[in-house]
């Protein structure tokens, strides 16, 4: 799977501009850099070791094996899991940070294999202990099948990222009916402009323009102090 074809890129964007979020960028980086924790107990793990060689070169998929579960996000179990090993396996899975994934590799890990027949110490399927995302049957599976399982897991992660983005995608926003906008005349009456006024501010706007009628004269003829200040200065000879 090509990382460029993941859900990070929108088909409507141009080739030179990418519009995304920090969360999508983090998910895209996680998709292209799965760090596995290898939990091999028997012969199936020998086939996985061949992936490290130059013939298959699993580094091209961003796989970097880690020895600590706190630095891994993929657990690959290969081989038989016994009852004594079950608590350790569950503890390793719980110490891995979220999001984390599990690949069950081989028949012994998936069903217990030939060791599960009349055995008192074999776990009949690792999915009884931890959740499994990809089942890889075979005794043992070939390296090509392991690469195919990793590709299938990356496709599953990309689908989860796309579903999360569609779930939390914000739609178009409109003014609700609670705003109660209406048309009102502007102060510039000569231009006959019309603007929106909020209903809550309507009473304040009208109260500021309201004048208590102390006299019947129009507003332009009301006498103000210092109205004849210019005439007083002319008489005083200033």
Swiss-Prot record:
Q: What InterPro entries does the entry give?
A: NADH_UbQ_OxRdtase-like_20kDa, NADH_UQ_OxRdtase_20Kd_su
Annotated localization: Plastid, Chloroplast thylakoid membrane
Cellular component aspect of the GO annotation: chloroplast thylakoid membrane; respiratory chain complex I
Assembly and oligomerization = NDH is composed of at least 16 different subunits, 5 of which are encoded in the nucleus.
Q: Any idea what this protein is called? A: NAD(P)H-quinone oxidoreductase subunit K, chloroplastic
* GO BP annotations listed: aerobic respiration; electron transport coupled proton transport; photosynthesis, light reaction
Q: Does the keyword Plastid apply?
A: yes
The family assignment reads: Belongs to the complex I 20 kDa subunit family.
Q: Pfam families, from UniProt?
A: Oxidored_q6
> Which EC number(s) does UniProt give?
7.1.1.-
Residues reported to bind [4Fe-4S] cluster: 43-44, 108, 139
Q: Name one GO molecular function term.
A: 4 iron, 4 sulfur cluster binding
Q: What class of enzyme is it?
A: translocase
Q: Which UniProt keywords apply?
A: 4Fe-4S, Chloroplast, Iron, Iron-sulfur, Membrane, Metal-binding, NAD, NADP, Plastid, Plastoquinone, Quinone, Thylakoid, Translocase, Transport
Swiss-Prot/TrEMBL catalytic activity = a plastoquinone + NADH + (n+1) H(+)(in) = a plastoquinol + NAD(+) + n H(+)(out); a plastoquinone + NADPH + (n+1) H(+)(in) = a plastoquinol + NADP(+) + n H(+)(out)
Q: What NCBIfam families does this protein map onto?
A: nuoB_fam (TIGR01957), PRK06411.1 (NF005012)
Query: What does the record say about how the cofactor binds?
Result: Binds 1 [4Fe-4S] cluster.
Which SUPFAM superfamilies does this entry report, sorted A to Z? Answer: HydA/Nqo6-like
Regarding the membrane, this protein is recorded as: Peripheral membrane protein
- Known function: NDH shuttles electrons from NAD(P)H:plastoquinone, via FMN and iron-sulfur (Fe-S) centers, to quinones in the photosynthetic chain and possibly in a chloroplast respiratory chain. The immediate electron acceptor for the enzyme in this species is believed to be plastoquinone. Couples the redox reaction to proton translocation, and thus conserves the redox energy in a proton gradient.
Which cofactor(s) does the record list? [4Fe-4S] cluster
Which organism does this record belong to? Cryptomeria japonica (Japanese cedar)
